[in-house]
Amino acid sequence: MQKKLLLKLSVVFLLLLKLIPVRASVVDAKHALSFKQHIDTLQTGSSLYLVDENQFPIAGLKIVNTKTKKTAITDNNGIAELSYSTGDVIAVYVQQSLVLKTEMSKDRNVITVSSKNPGVAALRPVRTLFDQTVKSTLSTMATDVVYGSDLTKSPVTSVKAAITGRLSGMFTNQNSGRLGSEGRTDGTAALISLGSLGSDAVTMSLRGQNPVVIVDGIPRPLTIFNMEEIESVTVLKDAVSTAMLGVKGASGAILITTRRGTKAKQTISFTAQTAVQKLLKVPQGLNAFQYATLNNEARVNDGLAPAYTAADLQAYQNGSDPQGHPDVNWTDLVTKPTSRFNHYTLNVAGGNDFGKYFVAVEHINQNGLFRTSDINTYDTDNTFKSYVIRSNVDLQINKKLSGGINLMGRLINSNDPGYGSQAILNSIYATPANAYPVFNPNGSYATTSSYQNNIYAQSVGSGYIGTYKRDVSADLFLKRTFDEITKGLWLKAKASIYATLSENTYRNKSFASFFYNPTTKVYTQYGTIGTQNNYTGINYQGHSDYEELSLGYDRNFDKHGLSAVVLANHDNSFTGSDLPYTVQGISGKASYNYDEKYVAELAFGYNGSNYYPPAGDYKYGFFPAVAMAWNINKENFLKDSKWLNTLKLYGSYGKTGNDNPGYFVYIQRYFDGTSTYFGSTPGSNTSIFEQVLANPNITWEKANKFNLGLQGTILDNKLGFTVEYYRDKYYDLLMQRGKNSALIGQSYPLENIGQSRYTGWDFKLNFQQSLNDFSYYIAATGGLQQSKVLYQNEVNQPYPWMARTGQAVGQRFGYIAEGLFQNTSEIAGSAKLEGHTAQPGDIKYRDLNGDGIINQLDQTVIGNTKPLFYYGLNLGFQFKGFDFSALLQGALNRTIYLSNNTEWAFQNNGFGQAWEHNLDRWTPQTAATATMPRLSIGTNINNEATSTFWQHSGNYLRLKNIEVGYTIPNSLTKRIGLQSIRVFGNATNLLTFAAYDRVDPEVYNGNYPLQRSINMGINIKF
């Protein structure tokens, strides 16, 4: 089925590709002829095509032939009419600032300028909602953008991972290193109002919120992407930029714009990459001798007899009895030191006056971390394969009518051991080295009565589970201009469908492991040897349709500019067997500017969702926003400034909404309960219970958002800067009342009562300079963010330090640790935890209320209360054919909390693993240097209580990506008929500098480890 679908999609895309020149020659020969003349002109040295490194045409550049002194300005297609000859030097300017000089040849007609140059970047239009763009100087919005040429420098498939450290206001955190596990972020938004960031493998936060995702103007899931198909990723952060989203605008938006064709000769680009990946910061367990020694110590501490004799310890130490005294490194046995990653992409782009096209095909093949066995005829590794095809076609049907179609197909096949990848890792983290040998003398899987399992069998003897995922989408749009009515008037219609499916093929099986008694020679079986399953089950399926009709007007009257759009849209989505989720409404925006100096903008959204009550004012909402901008550099008092190129002050304020009600929570829902017997002739009747109480007055969440920004370029457009301050108040947040009573016998309903506030600063600095053949750039992004819970109907607390209200959103509470008890005298004079008899080496806690008892009344804010500061530094250079880039990314004022089986020793009633850091435990001999509390068997309620003891600094700086490349001279590649050849190598997660470096600052507590990737590749353009 997969191959057939892939074949059908390929045929459709190739037919569309083939259709363009045929249609142009048959239907519109005039357009085709004009394009041929244009190409001929380019080839004879009278026109130039200026693009950035993303092949995006740049309008408004001034080019000068330094020999003839003739000048020209590039049009909206990046084309400038200027004669030149071989050897002529062409100078490119932004305003009066020189960008570069380049020597021309007769067969060269394309000049590439760097979008890293702040002046060039300012010439690129700013992406807004619903496929609209606005000139950078006329934008009043808080936005930031990263282009595809930067995203391709990291061999990742997650957009969330690729944008890390590259966008101001955006903070990402990678919680897992597994490819393809980035989590499914759908097109909806969620306010992180009184909770945490979530559980995706890569979480993202835009000014503290989970943004809505929009792909080519349409709400879509953020799943696997081919980075080479992305033109840009833009974030919208303030009210005026997202007001048209209405009930989906409060959390900001991420706009992913895929690449499109241009009016240029067809270009074919092929990239092949191969990488070696290695796990980082894998928890290190103790060997058998260390484990047995510490286990004895823990048992003595708890008043128990030692479990291991001196003979046992000696056998573990010298390895004389591997069957009876095993020493198995389960991590090395089950996992591989490295895995392979292969990545291939093929892109075709081009166009003429009639049509433009871009087609991209991608294949990824990654091996996993688990070893396999020759006993199986199938793969038990956790592998990942994906196939992505995208086709974007734009048609200029006639002078007034244009349109296009976007098609996308994505297939993902992943494989896991039948026992489950994370489950096997959990077993490794919970099983000591001396638990049991791998095999018994007869070759069967070994175990003991205490474990009744075998990790190696979990890995290679449990079969496999295959996961198949499919995503298909199609977008169709038409645009008609009505200049015959009034110049600048247009009408656009858009329709889209999207379908997704995820299903598992279960070929897993149960296995048996055996305990061998060497004295009796008897094998005791645990588990059963089962036949391999053979069935499929759907994990997730859904589809959606989206329709939009917009009417716009764009026109300039002398020094007055007016732009307006109003649209109606309908978004309908289905998930599984649930009732459809529908959002619909109207929205609009109007912008006025005077001489491109003063700008005023109004935006609104009026929409609603069927998840809200139909009666009253709960279903639909009105969300307005207003903004202004002032291009200060155009004032007379700054016109002659030599150091200042551009300077814009802008601000916005507005009301936005968030659609987060849950599934029809305004309707009371019931479920079946237990059976009851009653009546003269007893009969069984099933009872019915209420679920959470319904709220018939539930409505959308809201936010009042304020933004003030300053943006400019200085020093001949070499240095650009953006600084923004924001203050966002979120209210009517859905939550259950803290002041509630159990007397009603049911959970309280969700109500619109919560309030929180997020304030902060975003900044971006970028510098670029060209010195003959050498150019370099440095770009810094970052944000300072602080949140506060304003109201949550919190129960009255007996002490002020217990109050959650007034603290940061998601703030952790616990005990304040004051070191370790050193002796019984210190214990006697200190407060003690309820239900626990303290011993020397236990953690000592601060008695905040002074009652001599440690309990919940002594829990307070723990962790860093300073504003979170996150940052990225992107730098690089080009010298002749060589290029280099690096991305550093990190965070400050951040804490991590360590717990669970990978932190505490001897969990699971004393049968769990112990770790290298447990060697630094407290003993009478190590009291002065110990960093860990005394050892215990099983759970120690005192030492494992939530406290500052297990909390550490999460500050870090990571060399996220580094790349070195070389482009072979064109004089050599053209001899073999190629446009260019570039070879490159890059690496991800190469170095990490962490304030607390025992664990990875992002991936810890037993999650799938982060991976370092060393990658080599080649790009060939035809």
What function would you assign to each model-found segment?
Residues 307, 432-441, 457, 838-840, ...:
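Extracytoplasmic gating/loop element in the C-terminal half of outer-membrane beta-barrel translocons
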Residues 1-44, 86, 99:
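Cleavable N-terminal targeting peptides that direct proteins into the secretory/outer-membrane pathway or into
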Residues 392, 396-401, 406-411, 417-421, ...:
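Extracellular/periplasmic, surface-exposed regions of secreted and cell-surface proteins
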Residues 89-105, 116-118:
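A short, solvent-exposed loop/turn motif at the edges and junctions
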Residues 24-41, 110, 120-124, 130-212, ...:
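Membrane-proximal, glycine/serine-rich, low-complexity loop/turn segments characteristic
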Residues 68-79:
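Short, acidic Ser/Thr/Gly-rich low-complexity loop/linker segments typical of extracellular
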Residues 55-56, 81-88:
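Short Pro-Gly-centered beta-turn/loop motif in secreted/extracellular proteins
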Residues 36-38, 43-58, 221:
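Structural motif
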